[in-house]
């Protein structure tokens, strides 16, 4: 039962039932994505297997990384920060970020990171 005025029902989705694709940071399972926009979602969530990630940034979106497995290093504006299972990382818009090592993370983007909101330092071209 929905409370009157709500837009869509709650959602449960399992990683094994979610599409998987290659991203800038590694392989990701699309747990919640822009395809769910009609549900009124304000964010997306992906389970990502990071094996090193090229430094990049977003002008409009904030990201949260929660480390599920592994150990590595997250680079934020040139400063290296060790991360391990249980670490959480907040990445505001404009912060150049990347990673070293092999970690599995839950990445939440707020709002959804659009294709035209992925930039690489020194590049003048938008990348997807």
Question: What kind of feature is each model-predicted range?
Answer:
Residues 52, 60-72, 77:
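Glycine- and acidic-residue-biased ligand/ion/polar-headgroup-sensing regions
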Residues 55-56, 74-75, 91, 95-102, ...:
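Short beta-strand His + acidic residue motifs that chelate non-heme Fe in jelly-roll/DSBH
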Residues 2-23:
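Extreme N-terminal tail/first-helix region
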Residues 2-6, 38-41, 100-128:
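Double-stranded beta-helix
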Residues 17-55, 61, 108, 112, ...:
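A short glycine-rich, His/Asp/Glu-containing loop-to-beta-strand
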Residues 78-94:
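Short acidic-glycine-tyrosine-enriched beta hairpin
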């Amino acid at each position: 039962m929905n409370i009157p005025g709500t837009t869509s029902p709650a959602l449960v989705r399992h990683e094994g039932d979610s599409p998987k694709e290659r991203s800038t940071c590694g392989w990701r399972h699309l747990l919640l994505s822009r395809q769910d926009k009609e549900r009124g979602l304000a964010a997306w969530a992906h389970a990502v297997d990071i094996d090193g990630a090229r430094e990049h940034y977003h002008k409009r979106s904030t990201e949260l990384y929660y480390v599920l497995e592994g150990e590595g290093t997250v680079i934020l504006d040139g400063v290296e920060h060790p991360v391990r299972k249980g670490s959480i990382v907040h990445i505001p818009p404009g912060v150049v970020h990347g990673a070293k090592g092999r970690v599995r993370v839950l990445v939440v983007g707020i709002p959804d990171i659009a294709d035209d909101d992925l930039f690489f330092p020194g590049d003048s071209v938008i990348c997807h």
